[in-house]
Amino acid sequence: VYIASEYLIKLKSVTLKLCALKTFVVAEIGSNWEGSLKKAEKLIRKCKDAGADAVKFQMWRATDLYSNTHPSWNFIKKSEITFNIAAKLKKIADNESIEFFCSAFYPEAVDFLEKLGVKRYKVASRTCLFKDPQSIETLENKAKTGKPIIISMGMGGNRDQIQKIFSNNKVVFCYCISEYPLAYEKINWNKALQYNGFSDHTLGITAPIVFTVLKKFQDAKEILIEKHVKLKNSKGPDAPTSITINQLSELVSHIRLIEK
């Protein structure tokens, strides 16, 4: 990957005139904060140090999405982000000068995040299926904010209907396949390049670097990369397919080289 990045820089300087690329790098924390504000603060701080543009959390009510008989119920419940916790996470991120935003899964969460002054929202793949309670109401609340929206449709869904809901928002659709981990060979690069966002579930950092290089050659102006990030000792369900802080730092370094 390093050699590929360096080769691209040399090739651009000799033969190509490509526009500068701006890549918005999102560190998806997901469940890797494990219900611990101390771990969340450490993740936020380290993601900032690694060069990420934003940290993203998931704001849902456990009882809306899971049965209390779920084998991971205790962990799920512990990882629920309440209004009080969301406010604390936003303050931590503000103090570290890194953007904080969420995938919000119910309308009241959107209303509260508006009070906190978040700049954008994420729509998760499962929300695009309209099967969770109040999915449509949640999407409509996000649309009413007029703020930028990031959308993953890794489980499918009606893109036309979703685009209609967000007709007045700046929208970035992400290429995404909801498999954990996703085998690199399953990426359809021809299809991926139809998107300006890449929500990656492969192991390591190769896939998002390849996406960035290919979008650069497409002369894209702005793209988005989302990657799950963990601490070394993370044990939650997102941990096996998440990258470490060191890997995030390496990923961002490659992306910033490619952007120029």
Name the predicted role of every residue range.
Residues 2-260:
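Catalytic cores and adjacent flexible loops of soluble metabolic enzymes
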